[in-house]
Structures are given as C-alpha cells and as structure tokens.
Amino acid sequence: MVDDVSSTLVTTSSTTYISGLSGFDSSALIEAAVQAKLAPAYVLEARVEEDEAVLSSYSEMASLLETLEDTLNALRNEPGTLSDPSVFESRAAYLSSDDSSTPGNYFGVVVDENTEPTSYEIQIQQLATAHKISSDRQSSETDALGLDGVFSLGTGSSSADITIAADMSLEDVRNAINDSSDKSGVSASILQVSDTEFILVLSASETGQEISLSSVSGEDIAQNLGILNTDSSVKNELQTVQNAILSVDGVQVERSTNSIDDLIEGVSLDLYGANQDATFTLELDYSYSDVKEELLAFVDAYNAYREFALIHQDVDSSGNVSEDAILFGDDVLRGVNNSLYDSLNDTWDVDGVTYSLGSLGITFDSENALEVDETVLDAFLLDNIDVVAEMFEFQYESDDENLMVLSREGQIASGSYALDISVDGGGDITGVSVDGDDSLFEIDGNTLTGVAGSEVAGMVFVFTGTESSTVNISFSQGFADSLYNELDEYTNVVDGSLTEAKRAREERVSNATSEISSIESAAAAEEDRLITYYANLEAKIAVANALSDYLDAITSSDD
C-alpha cells in the first residue's frame, strides 16, 4: 500500500509535469530535446533578420534611385504624347526698357512651352477701357421712381430686356440690371455724390464694348433717368470705350481687351498701363533658372545616392566590413554604381565639339560625389544652353508630322534615317524600308517597332498618314534619357533587377517564416510528448517505489 508519493510540480513552456522521484532532471532533458528541434529555426531567424536588413536597404536604395530618376525625367523629354516635356522646353520672358521704366508695371507675359526663342520691341500707347455711363442725379435711392416700362440693355451682340415697374426705386433698378448682367454684359452700381444725390452707374463687363440702351415698351426708362438724351445719345459718359493700342516691332495693332493672346504665337500679354515714351524689349528664351534648378536637383539626388553607396561599401583600415555595410558585395549595388560611374564620365559630341559634365562646371570630388562651380555653370548656360539641351534630352526631328515617337526604352543609338513607308487604303502600313532594308521594323497596323538588335531597337513610332511617303527622321538619346533608362533596368516595378532582388528576398523571408512556424509547432508537439512521457515515467517510478517500500515493510515485520 502506498501511503504517500513525494513529488514536485515543474512548469516548462506553460505545461506542468511531475519531477523529482526518479532522480532524472527531466526538465533539462526536455529542454535539451526541444532546443535541438528548434536549432534549425534559430538559423532561419538569423537569416530572416539579415534578409530584412537587406530588404530595408533595398527599399532605401530604390527610393534614392527613384528620386534621381525624377530629376532625370525633367531633363530628358519623357516619352508619350501625354507626358511632361523636359525643362528645356520651358520658356521665360525677359523684359527690359530703353529708359528707367519698370516693364512689369506696364505689362505681364506668359510664354507657352517650346515657343520659338526670339525678341520683340513693344510700345504700349493706350489701354483698352470699359464703357461707363451714368444717370442724372436722383434725390433718393430708395423712393419709388414712378417709372413703368421695358428697355433693352447690352454690349456688342449681347442684350437683355429690363422690366421696370412704377413702385421700383433706384436700388431696384440696379438690382434688376445686375440680375441680367451675365446676359447683357453690363453691371450697375449706385454712387452717392452728396448727402441727397445719387447716380446709377452702368459699366460694361468687357473692355472695348460700347453700352447700348433702347426703349422696348412703356416709358423710356433710360431717357427718364437721364442716361440718354432725347436723341438717344449718351448723356452722361464717365469713361469712353477704347481699344488697346500698341506697336510690336513698329507695327501698330489694336485689340478690344488688355489680355492679348493672339498677337504673338505662344505668348499671352496682360497690359497694365500705357507709356508712349518707353520702348520695351520682350525676349523669349529658355528658362535659365528652371534649367539650373533641375541640374542642381540632379546633383543633389546623385550625391544622396552616393552617400548611401559609400555606407554600404565601407571597410576599415584593417579590411573589416562595417556593420552598416549591409549591401557590401551586392550585385545590384555594384551594377548601379558601375552604370552611374560610366554615364557620369561619358562625353557628348554636339556640332563637332566634345563636351562632358565638367564643361558645365559639374565635377567629382575626392569621394566621387558631384560638386558644382556655379559660376562656370551660369556662364555655360547663358552661352550654350542649346548645347546643354542636346547633351541631356532625347531629341527627335521629322520632316513629316504624321510620323511620331510613340515610346522608347533602353539604350538607343543616335542616327538619321529615310523611311520609305507604304500604306494601304485602310491607313495601315504595309511596308517600311531604309535604303532598301525592310528588316529594321516590325509592323502592326500603323505602328512601327524597331527590331531588337538593330540600330533602331527601342524605338516605337506611329504613322498617321494616309498615303505612302518617304519620311526623313533623326534622333539622339542624350545623357539624361540614357541614364534614366539604365536606372529603369534596376528600378522598373515589373522586371527591374532591384525589384526582382527584393522580390526574391521577400519570398525567402516568407518561406523561412513559414518554415520557422512549422519547426516551432513540431518542437511544441515534441515538448508536449516528452512532458507526458516523463510524467508517466515519474508516476510509474513512484508506484514502484511505493511498492518496494511496502514490501520492505512486510519483510521487516516478519523478522
């Protein structure tokens, strides 16, 4: 008979089991077995931690490269009909005067993108004015006028009928006119000229338009109010109507408005004041400040990436890799660095002269970061901005506007070609050749795609012409477009090598996380099994010990 079983409750991993009777340290045995099961998970967790550090670095790298690409985009001429043009297509108006007059006090200018650079001599002789007339003086603005009739009010070809009743005051007449101002082009206001005198003021909404009034029925309201004389002429004219008059390069022109957008192609003028004594020079040219701003933004974006790259290449004097160099030896990082180095050290021939970034005052420092001599840059932009445009942006010329660039990608060879394009009755291209070679393009409807490996690879054209013709084209890629496309091979969200490297790491982390979960589940199951096993073993030993003690007791009593 077992009088008592001595035991100890032991808790491991939130599971309680019996220990202490057998002399075995079952807790240690279970822990050792569980740790052996978990050992592969610890290896995987360490790898996941490393992979997540790499992924974080990849994300930072992608962000820095995307910022760099944004600056290149502004300098390259982004492909596509709906895309933003490069900064080299931006235009600015530069104003000066032949005397001390400040041009901005007399007119403002807005210039459309890609407007042809040129200059004009402008004189502003008079501004366009809006017609303004008034009634005779009235003794009250609130008393009933006692007038009953309908009159027509308008400007140009627009008019509205205004109905006046006998109980209406001067204020009511004003309100009735303003209720129809959108239709008539005339607004009304009341001017108090003394303590007891008021006049109704009629103002044309647009300059260069004369106000017209005529009686339609009933009393002649305009004559009774003193707006018109009995011969229907204007009685009280506060401001005459006149056109704007200005001369451009000695040619006098008139407009009915002070906002003029049909005088110089691509240019909108807003006239603020007349000055017959001053001649203003309007120069349309590249927006030098915008170009410089984008070039400096490119330098800043490159230097930000360069700082990142240096951190991940850092090795101390003993040859030990820095803990922060997460991407040390990474193929993607090495590839991007090589692409940038090669591109930034390239040269470009423009009109037989070879240029580099150094020509613009953009050079490398001792750490291979870019630095800018702004004095050199300013001078080069001022004297050679067209050269900078050719250096940086994709440029395309065609003698037929029906052949347009639809898209482009990759590294594109510069060249000039005469395309013999054959078109059927439905407008589809049936053939295209260059100097008799018909193997350069693939044809799909009215789309031409440069064959891979050919000198026109990467180019896609669309032809909207309806007749067969020969089209002469030329194109050159430029530094910004070339480097953008190189970086896109890494950052492209579909198949860029950086994107694919991130995707592979993410998949490895996902697989490892799943495997860790499986290992932990298996280890937990093994722990439960061992706990049960040792608990049963302890119980059996306890019973055996109790039986042994009982037998010893019987034997002793027999003695």
What residue ranges belong to the model's regions?
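Short amphipathic alpha-helical segments with coiled-coil-like heptad repeat character
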Residues: 59-60, 129-137, 310-313, 542-552
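Short amphipathic alpha-helical leader/targeting segments
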Residues: 65, 136, 264-265, 316, ...
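Secondary-structure transition/capping residues
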Residues: 41, 62, 79, 184, ...
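Acidic/histidine-enriched alpha-helical segments
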Residues: 193-198, 311-329, 333, 529, ...
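Bacterial flagellar/type III secretion structural subunits and associated motility module proteins
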Residues: 1-49, 70-199, 203-304, 308, ...
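Long, low-complexity, Ser/Pro/acidic-rich regulatory segments
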Residues: 513, 520, 531, 541-552, ...
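Contiguous, amphipathic alpha-helical segments that mediate oligomerization or scaffolding
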Residues: 45-76, 299-301, 305-321, 326, ...
